[in-house]
């Protein structure tokens, strides 16, 4: 029978000490490898290590940090202080307004609106002021402000309209100011969107929690899809997949599925939950017939040209200009800015000349995706490039290889609210996307986000806006000639999901955007003002509005 060789015999058979030392090292490595390969975690570790190397440059969400928490740095502390300061300012502007009965809240029917200092003749360029006195359902004058109002003047026959500026005196009275931009008969509209008591309730409910939306993540377990709960925060002691951006203090979580690596996250979807942070009494304020009720009773005027030849020559529209309120008006269905001179870009030749050798990055929600749907209808040489993927939320690319035009739309990252399944494989936050843009004089970035943030506490939106601002500042350090444009939110339809998607939330976010980006050399496309002027009450405005937005964009970059 053959005798087995022992390690001692093997060592003695080696010619010298160096050979014996090398043999021992190889033996130790072999033993370690055997132990590791028989352990239950080796497969997950290898997948994790391999994915970390391959995918790190593509997506921040492929960095799975088992134990690392978001740590404070001087930059993150400064950002959190800025978030807190903005939140405190907003809390002061929207104080609690408890109420006993619905009858004690603001009534559009009982409130009055009268023209302040009425004139016999109104001329183009004049200001029209309307004094609004808020009253409750008993006809008693309100002693505090805070009502959410939407003001507009319009002339249907001329397809003309513009928004009004509301000044709240915080005592139940409001001054609503309009600029008379066109001649002819003009009608007035002031809608009570929500009474101050409803505004207070929406603000409290918004900042109370994250439970109004349920996220579901789809992971790949081998070749089979498996589902689990996800969210911006999860109240559980179970093991979590943590998708953390440590620099920007952004976080998203999913419940860890047994045996499924966190890197196997492929898709996401969401739905509205049954959770509400409103009381039964507060919910009565948001029945459809209580929202967007007209205050004005048949107010109209006639505006004359008055031989007005004092129009000042306006500067050409350019990035960095301060946009007033209102930012412009519609006339014959076309948007006209109030503060700068526009080129019309009606001829396809002019549009092509503007876009030639341009790299255009559209970063944001589906209201920006409308741009990439509209452009090929006008510029026939722009063709879709199949970047694979499926569904409306995949990255869209348009190319004109002859004129060297590149246009890309990519959705923003969490939170993204939709019941349609969307891919997470190349998902990224806007600040990280900006960091990857080289930038030059032929590069333009358009950013728009907000609609998907409305269901969540306002600090989520504030933090994202600050992170976007910081990324733009970094971009300007390396490529100051790059053009950056911010498209604000637009108004949307009124539906039963007021607690989640009310335009009140959007109006607050618009104020925040203007505050955070006020000192940056960026262009502003005031989609809010445009959609009020057009009275486009749809989350996805019609093509006439999209055309006006793109027209403003072309004025900024050319």
From Swiss-Prot:
Signal peptide: none annotated. The chain crosses the membrane at residues 17-37. The gene is Nxpe2. Its main location: membrane. Keywords: Membrane, Transmembrane, Transmembrane helix. This is NXPE family member 2. GO terms for cellular component: membrane. It comes from Mus musculus. It holds the Pfam family NXPE4_C.
